């Protein structure tokens, strides 16, 4: 049979006595009201301790002004309830200064009595300042309340940083705009363009008239000044080459011009080897006269063969009288001038050798590159 209460009483009793302690016994259950009461008692205990500390602190004896202002402050506060305590203190100070010595005497005597009484009550009393202003100032500096001089503010940094930020924000939000005005001072902190290329050597082509005969290996910049690579098989004569060799080369040149008087700018193409042998001469190659003599003879043989193959077969003899041979010196870049003739020119007055090669080299390089590009 069922119980009259439907079994709820027995269930409540069972759950209340057995179920909760068994299942939830590992947790600590606290009532919120109990927590509030504990906090209140702790607060009261703390306030009592603070009052005890305040009462334990020995106050200094009052001076004459404090004795007079004790009752006067109350009277002014009743008359002027809206005034702030600071304003009341100012008014009390002015009133105290306006008093005569006779009116101040009773307050001075009362202050002296209080001082004597204080000495008798606390013979070991030593004054201790209530506030340590220096300590508080140091704490504020440590916590960062006071601005430090090492950290520049916006007014110290200037407008460059602010303008730079605005400039970046404009470009991040407006990528479609193609033209933007560069703000003033944006490139002041950047290095110039030449700063990033300081470590690279710029190729320079320079030949001095007083350069020595023997020198070290040629620099890398000298090779970069030419359009073709240097062919080491063509090496010119040394400065003290024999005069008959020079005369022989002059004769070869005149014979070639007489055989083909109409050979002009459009007449032939010069091989890069011939061009390199005439144009670029490293000074360190001037120290091998024996090898130079053998290579020089083979050089001019090959030059004669190349020029004869490229010259036209038909020759007009009636044009020989109309052509000035000196005119070809400024147009014909392929004629096999001797290396000694290109580099060393004899001064008629002094009889000394001079090396003025740079202007001729520049003109030859420009013309040959133009003719090779045109394909003639």
Curated annotation (Swiss-Prot):
* Pfam families in the cross-refs: HMG_box (PF00505)
Its keywords, alphabetically, are: Activator, Developmental protein, DNA-binding, Gastrulation, Nucleus, Transcription, Transcription regulation, Wnt signaling pathway
- Is the keyword NADP in the record? no
Which stretch carries the motif 9aaTAD? 326-334
* Compartments where located: Nucleus
Q: Taking every annotated instance into account, which residue ranges of this chain make up the domain Sox C-terminal?
A: 259-376
Gene Ontology molecular function terms on file: DNA binding; DNA-binding transcription factor activity
| Annotated DNA-binding residue span(s) | 58-126
Segments for region (Required for transcriptional activity and interaction with ctnnb1): 327-331
Domain of life, source organism? Eukaryota
**Cellular component aspect of the GO annotation:** nucleus
What InterPro entries is this protein classified in? Answer: HMG_box_dom, HMG_box_dom_sf, Sox_C, SRY-related_HMG-box_TF-like
Database matches in SUPFAM superfamilies: HMG-box
Q: In which tissues is it expressed?
A: Expressed throughout all the deep and superficial endoderm during gastrulation. Expression then declines rapidly after gastrulation, however a small patch of endoderm cells behind the cement gland maintains expression even into tailbud stages.
Share an example GO biological-process annotation for this protein. ectoderm development
- Which PROSITE patterns does the annotation name? HMG_BOX_2, SOX_C
- PANTHER family, alphabetically? SOX TRANSCRIPTION FACTOR, TRANSCRIPTION FACTOR SOX-17-BETA.3
The domain comment in this protein's record states:
The 9aaTAD motif is a transactivation domain present in a large number of yeast and animal transcription factors.
Q: How does it assemble?
A: Interacts (via C-terminus) with ctnnb1/beta-catenin (via Armadillo repeats); this interaction is required for inhibition of wnt-signaling.
Q: What does this protein do?
A: Transcription activator. Doesn't appear to bind to the consensus 5'-AACAAT-3' DNA binding site, but binds 5'-ATTGTT-3'. All of the sox17 proteins are required for embryonic endoderm development and gastrulation movements, and show some redundancy in function. In addition, the sox17 proteins have distinct but overlapping roles in later gut development. Acts downstream of vegt-signaling in endoderm differentiation to induce a range of endodermal genes both directly (including endodermin and dhh/chh) and indirectly.
According to UniProt, the name of this protein is Transcription factor Sox-17-beta.1
